[in-house]
């Protein structure tokens, strides 16, 4: 571990104190206050209650683990359930509130699938590496924050994260097209199998970096190194640390879709911070963290407030995109714990952005409903699980100064691992299944909006203008 880790808590506390004082000059929200730890905890509790109103998997006749969907049955694809549980695990970690822990555990275990690798058969027709990766990252988070372990006869958090990583590291998912890298979709029959993208590889990179640190295992770190290098070499990440969406294998990944999404930056930024920590402060990873951090602030914050450049100006965001700001806040916060040199720059920024987030949570019916556009200062009538998850992540992570940094198996981690997890998965020769219209329109995290890059909203990004 880097020698700076020992002074991390005091440094973060000092920066947070400054940030809270600075935020006092900002107009406070009508409903939520975040001026003190008690205020933050109270606001986070209300936001957690609000976001869980969108979840019905713990009700009779419903499927545990998923938000209503997929379309046309509801707004949400399978992956966003996994993302929700990550937000709720962080909520517990920062606040200590155990209200939803049993619901989270049931949800996370219900969706593991028969091979305990987060590939349940009922989502095969829209299963992407990124979808699986989000569930794997939530399992990894559970291990890192010592979220209560499942019963001994159930899959364990660390083993689930390893299973996801192992299935994605299998040679069956890494072909020679475009010089390597993961495809977006997993089954060859799926729409999008011919597309390689940043988020699929970013989730894999992120998991590899975190497993390397947690287990002190160089094999995972080698995969993380290799993945970062490939993403740069193929042009998905440019010299200015802009991360683009992806490209098709038929063009050898030369037809890069230049859409930029904040969760791509966030997933790579957190992974790079873990690599910095694992390598005991290697200057290569420090430079990468700094470069990507500056790019993230440059591209995805307006006046120090989180902003989704691909879609927010004209509100063309898909349901998926409406959840990205929360990952930015949550993962940048964790970065300050494992790469403490970033704290002085990041924590005041996130405090300002969180204040803007709660300022607009004034919607009906009770004046606490959150919208999506934080820079406007007013409620924008855009409501949903993603919008509320965003604010929950932004608010709860303000308590980082009193939270323990992610643990490892050498520093108090309790989750049991399995280096062979996922090895029994038949994950690369899936029998083709009929693809429905709904699957074609929106399979996985990135919807047909990405593959349909001719849509007017994305013309300027596709042409680099």
Residue ranges and their predicted role:
Residues 2, 9, 18-42, 49:
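N-terminal signal peptide
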Residues 32-130, 134-136, 142-143, 149, ...:
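CBM-like carbohydrate-recognition segments
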Residues 43, 99, 103, 153-156, ...:
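Alpha-helical positions within canonical tetratricopeptide repeat
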Residues 95, 139, 146, 208, ...:
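Long alpha-helical scaffolds in large eukaryotic adaptor/regulatory proteins
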Residues 201-215, 219-276, 289, 293-296:
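Active-site cradle of extracellular carbohydrate-active enzymes
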């Amino acid at each position: 571990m880097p020698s700076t880790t020992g002074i991390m808590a005091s440094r973060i506390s000092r920066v947070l104190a400054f940030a809270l004082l600075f935020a006092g000059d900002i107009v406070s929200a009508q409903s939520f206050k975040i001026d003190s730890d008690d205020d933050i905890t109270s606001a986070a509790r209300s936001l957690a209650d609000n976001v869980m109103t969108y979840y019905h998997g713990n009700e009779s006749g419903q499927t545990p683990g998923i938000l209503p969907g997929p379309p046309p049955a509801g707004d949400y694809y399978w992956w966003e359930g996994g993302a929700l549980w990550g937000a709720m695990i962080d909520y517990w970690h920062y606040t200590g509130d155990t209200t939803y822990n049993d619901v989270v555990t049931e949800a996370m275990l219900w969706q593991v699938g028969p091979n305990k690798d987060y590939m349940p058969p009922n989502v095969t027709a829209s299963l992407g590496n990124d979808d699986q990766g989000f569930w794997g990252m939530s399992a990894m988070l559970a291990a890192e924050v010592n979220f209560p372990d499942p019963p001994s006869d159930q899959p364990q958090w660390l083993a689930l994260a390893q299973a996801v990583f192992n299935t994605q590291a299998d040679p069956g998912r890494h072909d020679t097209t475009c010089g390597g890298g993961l495809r977006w979709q997993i089954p060859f029959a799926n729409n999008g199998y011919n597309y390689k993208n940043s988020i699929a590889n970013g989730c894999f990179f992120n998991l590899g970096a975190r497993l390397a640190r947690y287990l002190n295992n160089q094999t995972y770190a080698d995969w993380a190194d290799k993945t970062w290098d490939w993403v740069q070499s193929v042009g998905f990440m440019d010299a200015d640390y802009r991360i683009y969406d992806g490209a098709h294998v038929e063009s050898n990944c030369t037809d890069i879709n230049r859409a930029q999404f904040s969760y791509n930056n966030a997933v790579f930024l957190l992974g790079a911070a873990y690599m910095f920590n694992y390598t005991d402060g290697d200057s290569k990873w420090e430079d990468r963290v700094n470069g990507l951090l500056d790019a993230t602030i440059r591209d995805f914050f307006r006046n120090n407030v989180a902003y989704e450049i691909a879609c927010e100006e004209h509100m063309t965001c898909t349901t998926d995109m409406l959840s990205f700001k929360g990952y930015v806040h949550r993962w940048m916060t964790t970065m300050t714990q494992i790469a403490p040199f970033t704290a002085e720059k990041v924590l005041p920024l996130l405090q300002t952005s969180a204040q803007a987030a709660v300022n607009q949570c004034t919607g009906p019916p009770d004046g606490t409903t959150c919208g999506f556009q934080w820079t406007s200062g007013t409620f924008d009538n855009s409501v949903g699980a993603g919008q509320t998850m965003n604010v929950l992540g932004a608010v709860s992570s303000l308590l980082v100064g009193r939270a323990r940094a992610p643990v490892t198996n050498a520093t108090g981690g309790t989750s049991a691992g399995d280096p062979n997890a996922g090895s029994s998965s038949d994950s690369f020769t899936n029998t083709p299944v009929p693809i429905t219209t709904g699957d074609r329109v929106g399979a996985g995290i990135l919807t047909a909006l990405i593959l349909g890059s001719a849509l007017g909203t994305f013309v300027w990004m596709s042409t680099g203008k």
